From Swiss-Prot:
Compartments in which it is found: Cell membrane
Subunit architecture: Forms homooligomers.
Gene3D superfamilies, per the entry: SH3 Domains
Side of membrane Cytoplasmic, spans: 1-31, 85-93, 143-357
Name this protein carries in UniProt: High osmolarity signaling protein SHO1
Entry GO CC: plasma membrane
Keywords, ordered alphabetically: Cell membrane, Membrane, SH3 domain, Stress response, Transmembrane, Transmembrane helix
Domain of life: Eukaryota
Spans within the Extracellular topological domain: 53-63, 115-121
InterPro entries on file: SH3-like_dom_sf, SH3_domain, Sho1_SH3
């Protein structure tokens, strides 16, 4: 079968931004969005019809309830657009605040109309009560992290599966920053670091306005921290060529160990991918727990041949089972059963149900 071209793979990775296009399937693939928005729309129609009927009668109608009706329909339209553009995680806090305001509005309108007599006011009050219930459900969902039990249970019914958790990712990065990385071949690695300059840890993307040293307190200690860019050129180190360097005496070994020179994972955006990865994808680190770096299991849908000029890509066969992590971008970091690590195109694999254990 036809394989992806190296130029196409590089072109995809050169753009660190994910394009969001209007796609109705993103909305239709989420049962929670369809169900809640459908019920909210029906409730809104009931509230609108009841309010018009009450206002047309002799009974005085609270004018603020009209703004409640307008605000609620604008909120539903916004949610529909956000789902179609797949921007829910980007505007989660805004949605939570907007829904919280809507909950206050609908609750106030309910309190103003529910005590009116007649079927017309009863219909309007029922519509506002249903809208208040839907708004409360939205506050619980959008106000919670994707890793929360309620969100994970709700997202499990979605065709796209459970959404990635920013909280879990940040916690994993924080844990990994407290654990020193131990290279597989420390003696040659230490020798290479002596001849390498140690730049300050910084974000590669200057457009974000982040510069300077992010970890100044740590850099002032005796332990040296190396940016992932220092490792460029070392990724294809031949095992056989490094074996002679392992023949050193115990004194040199003690000296190297006492220097405590290591690489700590840095939260930096790799220029070759559109995902945030530390320590050059974390491919040359042993942070103690493999599940932190490769928590998911994926199956290869097609055969992929890695670009020989790209040191980070790995090849795999159709049907091969891989351990993957950082699954938010087009390129995922992966580990094969033979221990080989690298990056793979996400459209060539599919995630299996559940996390790896």
């Amino acid at each position: 079968m036809a394989l992806i071209k190296a130029s196409q793979a590089r072109a995809v990775r050169e753009n660190p931004h994910v394009s969001h296009q209007f796609n109705i399937s993103s909305f239709l693939g989420d049962p929670f969005a369809i169900g809640t928005l459908s019920i909210a729309l029906i409730s809104w129609i009931i509230a609108l019809a009841g309010s018009i009927a009450v206002a047309a009668s002799t009974s005085p109608f609270p004018r603020f309830s009209w703004w409640t009706i307008v605000y609620e329909i604008l909120l539903m339209i916004t949610l529909f657009i956000v789902y179609c553009l797949d921007l829910v995680d980007y505007y989660r806090m805004f949605i939570t605040c907007a829904v919280g305001i809507a909950f206050v509005y609908t609750s106030n309108s309910t309190n103003s109309i529910v005590y009116y007599e007649g079927s017309k006011s009863g219909a309007a009050a029922a519509g506002f009560i249903l809208l208040s219930m839907i708004n409360l459900v939205w506050v619980i969902y959008f106000g919670g992290d994707n890793a929360s039990p309620t969100n994970r249970w709700i997202d499990s019914f979605s065709l796209r599966g459970i959404r990635p958790s920013v909280l879990e990712t940040s916690m994993a990065i924080a844990r990994s920053q407290r654990l020193p990385v131990k290279p597989s071949y420390p003696y040659q690695y230490q020798e290479d670091l002596r001849s390498a300059s140690l730049p300050d840890v910084h974000h590669d993307d200057e457009g974000e306005g982040h510069s300077g040293n992010m970890y100044a307190p740590e850099l002032q200690s005796s332990t040296k921290y190396v940016s992932s860019t220092v490792l460029n050129g070392f990724e294809n180190t031949d095992h056989s060529s490094s074996k002679p360097n392992l023949d050193v005496n115990a004194q040199n070994t003690a000296t190297l160990n006492t220097q405590a020179t290591g690489t700590f994972i840095t939260d930096t955006t790799n220029a070759n991918t559109d995902t945030t990865m530390g320590d050059t994808l974390g491919l040359y680190s042993d942070i103690g727990e493999e599940l932190n770096s490769f928590p998911y299991t994926a199956e290869a849908l097609y055969t992929y041949q890695a670009d020989q000029t790209d040191a980070y890509e790995i090849s795999f066969e159709q049907g091969e089972i891989l351990r993957v992590g950082d699954i938010e971008g087009r390129w995922w970091k992966a580990k094969k059963s033979n221990g080989e690590t690298g990056i793979i195109p996400s459209n060539y694999v599919k995630l299996l149900d559940g996390k790896s254990h």
